[in-house]
Every structure is written in structure tokens, then in C-alpha cells.
UniProtKB/Swiss-Prot annotation:
GO CC list: plasma membrane
Subcellular location as annotated: Cell membrane
PANTHER family from the UniProt entry: GLYCOSYLTRANSFERASE, UDP-N-ACETYLGLUCOSAMINE--N-ACETYLMURAMYL-(PENTAPEPTIDE) PYROPHOSPHORYL-UNDECAPRENOL N-ACETYLGLUCOSAMINE TRANSFERASE 1
Chief localization: membrane
Name of this chain's protein: UDP-N-acetylglucosamine--N-acetylmuramyl-(pentapeptide) pyrophosphoryl-undecaprenol N-acetylglucosamine transferase
Keyword rRNA-binding: no
Gene Ontology biological process terms, A to Z: carbohydrate metabolic process; cell division; cell wall organization; lipid glycosylation; peptidoglycan biosynthetic process; regulation of cell shape
Amino acid sequence: MRLMVSGGGTGGHIYPALALIKQVKQSEPDSQILYVGTSKGLESKIVPDSGIDFKTINIQGFKRSLSLENFKTIGLFLSSVVKARKMVKEFKPDVVLGTGGYVSGAVVFAASMMGVPTVIHEQNSVVGVTNKFLSKFVKKIAISFEAAASQFPTKKVVLTGNPRATEVAQIKPSGLSQFGLDDKVPTVLIFGGSRGAEKINQVTIDTLEELMERPYQTIFVTGRVHFERLTKDIDLAKYQGKIAILPYIANMPEILSNMEVIVGRAGATSLAEITSLGIPSILIPSPYVTNDHQTKNAMSLVNNDAAEIIKESDLTSEALINTLDTLMLDQKFRNVMAENAKKMGQPRAAENLYDVLKSVSK
């Protein structure tokens, strides 16, 4: 298979693409793959570091208010389509996959206009602007949440799940002794995303003394940019053996399966990971994302009794510890929630998406 992939800007668009590429290489070792992204997005480092051929297109998003910048954006989009056509013509892909972000709009649109089979993957419950635009032109639309189906042309939609779920399900877990914790003690992970989340961090700091009294242990990941400020007045040694306070965990997927409960945001990739592993969660959707899509992602789990939700505006030390205790001190309830999360998981998501690509490829 000659596969062209495009997706960029955030990890939520990039990591599912990389997981799919891994599946393609496993299934077809002689496959040829080209990833098209931007020079400024996260993909410009992550993709080449993964050993994947990478080319760039200069593009930017539209401003939500009336702006002269939008005229520049239209010009950039049109020139990006021209550049994308040239890349498609040179690479001659059997199929093109877009995983979101403005760059995928130019690439997938160009390929569609050239008669090349195209597929888009939507990670969220609420459809992104780029994928909504592309849905008119592509052959198939792969979705991660059933809630997204009604926002697309019905005949094109396939529920595949998020390919990241497959990757995480296959990772060999590592122990908790590396953090000074006991592998046999039930553990909670509190994690506000790779950059951390200020409100989650502050409330967790305010809850440390209560967490010390609980029969479970905690891993609290602050995000690198917040760590020094949050811990400058804290005696970290005081919490050793009970609460591990860390700036970042490089091998995060390796420790997830050791968690009894995860507290964090409701990004699409995170939810794909925790449902794939069948882990109960307390979700605190980010109020800063487009169309409040994290709340809608979270409700997909809450409505299936696979997660609890706390709005950031309602997040207090009391709300956090009470919700944690509800899950962590009631193993029967936690087990039911874990089963429900597992039922929602799509550990074959990468294979499912690969099958969709094969079904439309030349």
C-alpha cells in the first residue's frame, strides 16, 4: 500500500495517525508511507522522530471573528492545495487519510479532486471544522464515537474507534516501584494532560493531606511547566511511598494498566486509551476547547456508566476526594464501571481503520 497521511497541530490528530501507520507497517512491511504536516505543528518533530517520511505545507486556521487574516488564510489554503496536488502527483498514493487539523483539509481535498480514494478519521464526538468540510468529498468517514455519526453523511460512516487504543492495548505494562509506590496497592492517576491543567493541579495540591489518609496511593502528574511553581513550597519527601508528584511521565501508556482510576481531561485520545484498557475514570472536561467537545466526549462514557464527570467550574478539593472515595472505596462499583469502560473500548481500532483504507484503495 502507498499511503499518504495528513494530520497536525495537536497530539490528538497526530498520535492516532502514527498508530494507524504502525498497523499498516505490521500488515504490509513493504508499504510506502508519506506524512504531510506543517513545519510549526507538533508533527514536525514527532513524525520524523518516528522514522516516517515527512513533508510540510504552510497553512493556518481561520479566525472565528471577521479578520483581514482570514483573506490571507484563504490564499494560503489555495496555495496549499496546489502544493498538495503536486505531492499527490509525485507520491502516487493508493489512498489518502486525513486525521484532522487544517493541513489535512488541503491534502485530502486535493487528493479527492484528483480522483484518489480518500478517508478521514474523526476522533471526537463533535465534528471538527476541517472534517465537516471534507466529508462531502471523501469515500469513507471513520469515527471514534457513535455520537459523531449523525453529523456526517450516513452511508459513508464507519465506527472504527481511535487507533491509539490498539497501540496502548499492546504495550507491556511497567511497575510502580519506579515511582516509589507499591504495585499491590490500588492506585489513582491524576493527570491534566501533557501540559498540565492549572485548576486540576491546584485542587489536587489542596487535597494532598486527605489523599495521604486514604488506603489507596496516588500518582499526580503536574505537567512540566507547572511543576516547579506548584512544588516550591512542598516537602516532596513527606509524601514518598504514598503520593508520587511528578512533572511528566515519558512512558505514560506503560503505567496506565496499573491504575484503578484515572482523573483527567476528556480528550479523544485519552478516552480511547482508558476504554481500551477498561479503566474507570473521573473526567474533568477542558472548558477551553472548541464547541465544548470534551464534555460531549465525556458524556459518551458517563451515559454508559463508564465514568464520572466533574465540571471544572464545580471542581473543589471536596468534590474531588468525595468522587475518588466513591470509586476507590467500593471495589464492586469500580469493577462494574471498569467492565462498562471495557465494553466501549476498541482495541482493534487500528485494524478497523486499516480495513477501511484497504476497502477504498486503488
